[in-house]
Amino acid sequence: MGVTGGLVRSIFFRNKSFGAHDYNNGRGNLGEKKRWSSVRSYLCGDEFNSVRAVNDSESIKDSEALLTMSQQLSSEFGMPFGSVIAIEDSASVRHLEDEDSGSVKSSEATVTQPLLEEKSKGLDCYLKEEDVEDNQSEATETHIPKKHQTTPISKLFLEEDAAVIIQSAFRSYLAIRRSKEEEETFAKEESFSGEESQDNASMGTSLEAQTGNSVKAPFFRRKRVSANRRTLQKNNTQVLRIKEDWDDSTVSSTISKSRIQSRVEAMTKRERALAYAFSQQLRICSKKKQIDRSSEDDSNIGWSWLERWMATRVPDSIPIEPRTDVATKNQSLIRKNRAFGTAGELESCASNDLPLHFESISETQGDATTVLQTEKSSFKPSISKRKSVPSYKSQRKHHKLQATKSDLQQQTKKAKKAKTTPTSCKTGNECEETSHKLNSST
């Protein structure tokens, strides 16, 4: 009502005070004022009707004050005609005021009735719920004077405000309850998270058993796709770096493009060469490892530590004196064989010592067998059966060892012939002696 009401008043309400020179114009414009009042009530509707009668009364009082002022002026300046005009003007003004008030009341009645009907239909639900409050308010209104009683429009506004307050409170209550329910559900989910994870694992295994495919297959596919994308991005970034390099040369675009392409090709060739060299290094290292393993296996193919100990071990029945003689003979043979294999020691660390050591063992075994035969012939009645059994067993073991030793010696001879040359011998006599010994041992 604020601005629009002021505009309506400024347009439709005219000053009700007329001077002496406007007397005839005032009477001629009565019909126009009536028309304006009807138009005003039709157009302005609620805004005009909402203007209270207080404003009208104030305007009427202003007009009366102006009329009194005009009468005083006419009396002071000695204008009797003006006084008559003023009286007639006051009568006409009062008549117009009565007509305006009647039109305003009729317009208010016509406008407020449909508005009240429409709003009452929309607010039946609120009125039904608050019948008790309305009855109480009506009971109190009987005691309230007419000046303080509220209009039906203000009552509707109060009811709407109360409904808004009630709805806001109810919505806040619903929001609080919803938040509490969400917190409770979240706590329950956290408490049962362990059981759900086990259920998920069992479901995954059951799916694998039913379909025959692993559940992680799409995960690996995604990994492959991501790896391919990364390689493509790396290649693209390298090309972009080459292109982004500042080129100060005054060369055509075709030549610059050919240069960039040549750089890319050179880079790819370099990468291929590095990859090939790395693969060759891996192959060489793997071959070396295989050779080392094979050599270790070949060295382990020979006798075990127990067999070697049994071969070098002398039987318990041999006296002490012949043992010392055997040791001196073995030492002399080993010295001669070492003098023979000085040139071959440069190639291998201990390849020549083992077979020669076996040769010395074979010779000692012959001597040991002769000694045993003499002892048996001389001490037949004195030796018991229990002591004689292990001696025969030891002889059988020695014969078996000799057979295996002979095979190994033949293999070592072949290897020596393939590796060493006849220049390895210092003197012909030593070579003949060693060859004669080898033949005698075989």
From Swiss-Prot:
Compositional bias of kind Polar residues: 199-212
Single GO cellular component term: nucleus
Keywords tagged on the record: Calmodulin-binding, Nucleus
Predominant location: nucleus
Region (Disordered): 184-212, 375-442
Protein's cellular compartments: Nucleus
Residues in IQ domain copies: 159-188
Superkingdom as given in the UniProt entry: Eukaryota
GO terms, molecular function: calmodulin binding
Motif (Nuclear localization signal): 385-392
Region annotated Calmodulin-binding, chain positions: 270-282
Bias (Basic residues) ranges: 383-402
Functional note: May be involved in cooperative interactions with calmodulins or calmodulin-like proteins. Recruits calmodulin proteins to microtubules, thus being a potential scaffold in cellular signaling and trafficking. May associate with nucleic acids and regulate gene expression at the transcriptional or post-transcriptional level.
Membership in a protein family: Belongs to the IQD family.
Known partners and oligomeric status: Binds to multiple calmodulin (CaM) in the presence of Ca(2+) and CaM-like proteins.
Name of the molecule in the record: Protein IQ-DOMAIN 33
The species this protein was found in: Arabidopsis thaliana (Mouse-ear cress)
Gene: IQD33
